[in-house]
């Protein structure tokens, strides 16, 4: 390995070096500063005799006298089952004071695309115990379902609730028959979150014993921003190893993707690239896709990778490039809502703009319950109508509305108070969620339920609720 | 992707930046296919400046560095054409994904190449010419049963000079065996090649007059597309672009479907791969896959191959058109294609146009959509390519460059609407914004083949919907009850048009496909409600009583009524509506 002391330029996170041998694109670099600090970086551009390096740990202390070593390989993550229960920094080094990691394998963190022909279509229902998700936006194994949130909203609590409660109902029934193979594991990748938030997560993991089956990657707010581009890839490489080599069902929580995208923009700006929308690089869609698409199931493999990335929408604007590009890649989104939050609804999930694209194949007879699809459609339609009428009420008042309209308004209120607002501690199974849905739907006369199959109405309609409503 | 015969020249890598590589000392022409680096990654020449050749590479370039070799094949990006393309799934440069899976497992590795059609499969060749016949370019010389649905026609290649047939084979052959020989010495095989960026020639382009029947009420009923037409489906995420595209791929009455998943989700392509072999084609009853070719370049697959997948798809479509088939091509999503162009362009440091897209964006889009049309082929047959492109505008804002440049070309516009999607009104196609410029030229077909007053009834529905959107503005201010009774009634009728007719459940076994006869019948039921209700109103019946008859809600169930029962059901509902309303006065 040759060492160079030929740095010609340092600019933000980037270092330019002259070389006299060919260097591979994406290759890993070590830079040693005169005072002995070793920083790692990656080749961003390689020309004859000249390379651009992106330094992960910040370029502080790097000058023309620093020496540069090219390691001749791309960035690898050491993987082993023993990573479970460990806490690592954003570059994959242990920070929990535990023993060194003895890897089974070292895997390239960029990851290769799963051949669509080798994928298995996700259709195994994951019960999160949250009605707004299970009933209305069902999560399935192998899905990528982000939480679109805003600053100051309790997205962390929701993510923790899901991590705590997530289960697959069928398997509970036959728990011990299942060999250890299909155990559940959580890979947690934190990018640029505050130490306080990090503590919240860690406390919850420790309190509930979840840490034992988790791998935690921590890049905190004061850690180098460039490292954030590596953290999720480390996390996903670990998740893929656990899922496809060790048969775990892995839930990956990535928070906060907004910080990740900021880091991308920072690098793009340092490289003087032509910026795309709002200064984010033009390749951000491709870059994000390379993360999000690393969820899924593979034919013939036991395990699965399910992703719940969290992002805070700047200004609560879902047309901002970060949520916008994310929404185009992920299979739906769970939207947190500020108004619901200030009304004290927990979790403040607004189901109307939320969506799970894989829901339809994961629910129904044999999977959840035969009436699930129809109930959810009808709840959506009714809540949307009620919500729309609220605007009108503000202008004309309730009295000016018909009995039918008033009923929809009542429904919307009860839907939020009873169906959505369940608290972060309540774990509802899917039966409970659907029965609650029927109780609310039964506020309407049967003829209003045009999204529900007539047979299902006969089976589930709660008669006395309708009587009460008309009696009022 | 067709396999290169020989290496014409070799150069050396000078620099690498993502998918863009420059090489020196390479003698190449624009769009030549080259193999890059020690691993032989496939790429295409996109710029030549002095001694420096710029290449876009179709695979990941990690670890590739200066000094490694670049081999030029001297040929443009070319697809393999021949039997075996249907029932296949390809990546963006026509490498069969099932073959790649066999060779490198579940994850896509680099540097593996495979021909687009299996060269070892035996096909039963049935000649349609005999020795002594004169044939010219494009003529059919024989047929092969490619799938249960499709008879593959073996054509004299478009660039051939033709000649007299001197020898004809019949029986079982692989695609590279010669099946017909001409007096010019030309040998014709089932296997042909064609460069993807060049349109395959035809005699003439004609005005399309036949609809591509989609089985979707809002499309056939309000905004039809012609066989040979072009359509765009723009919409924000979650508004149902992919579901609409897939419904069209499943139920449109095309002979051949080419489905391009361009920069979209892996799981979506898997869904298609799993569903299509199971689902029956409503025209033939055979599995849908028997008429379908899939091209999957998912969002995490190399970006340069995303740029090429659109061309790969349309070239395959043109080849089947040459046989006289009606081909429907779905491109989901053309925005990802445009973004791939933008990404490559920005790596080349080209002067950007609007929003960073290259200045040639509009030209590329129109070149692509112009490859659609209703054509007269050289062999005398007529074939068509209908192109339906999804557009994913950032933030759902239709004023962005890809949507705008697409709208200047396409003649059908199906605008998806996030408000409708949030209310779970699917397909979430906004009836105020959408349009079809084919309506007038297709009406004669509907009149001849479905019903006489197809156009009149559609106009009635459009008028009611227009009136509704005007009234809705007033309702927003004063509430519904403040409106005069006749207007309240119009709103009620419009609600039935929306809920019983425009809405369609793509997941329901019956409702997902609605033949034009049923589309007409459901609407005629609502029209009866309209006419009878107004009769009753004129006779002095209060509007609450009119709207509370129990026959009307049954209209909402018509979508899910089986196709063979709907006629009787509609007739019965009409009769009951009439009876119940007339009882009121």
Curated annotation (Swiss-Prot), chain B:
- Among its keywords, does the record have Nucleotide-binding? yes
Under InterPro entries, the record lists: ATP-synt_VA_C, ATP-synth_a_Xtn, ATP_synth_asu-like_sf, ATP_synth_asu_arc, ATPase_a/bsu_AS, ATPase_F1/V1/A1_a/bsu_N, ATPase_F1/V1/A1_a/bsu_N_sf, ATPase_F1/V1/A1_a/bsu_nucl-bd
Q: What is its EC number?
A: 7.1.2.2
- A single Gene Ontology CC term: proton-transporting two-sector ATPase complex, catalytic domain
Give the catalysed reaction(s), semicolon-separated: ATP + H2O + 4 H(+)(in) = ADP + phosphate + 5 H(+)(out)
Subunit structure and binding partners: Has multiple subunits with at least A(3), B(3), C, D, E, F, H, I and proteolipid K(x).
What is the similarity comment for this entry?
Belongs to the ATPase alpha/beta chains family.
Q: What is this protein called?
A: A-type ATP synthase subunit A
Q: Which organism is it from?
A: Halobacterium salinarum (strain ATCC 700922 / JCM 11081 / NRC-1) (Halobacterium halobium)
- UniProt lists the gene as atpA
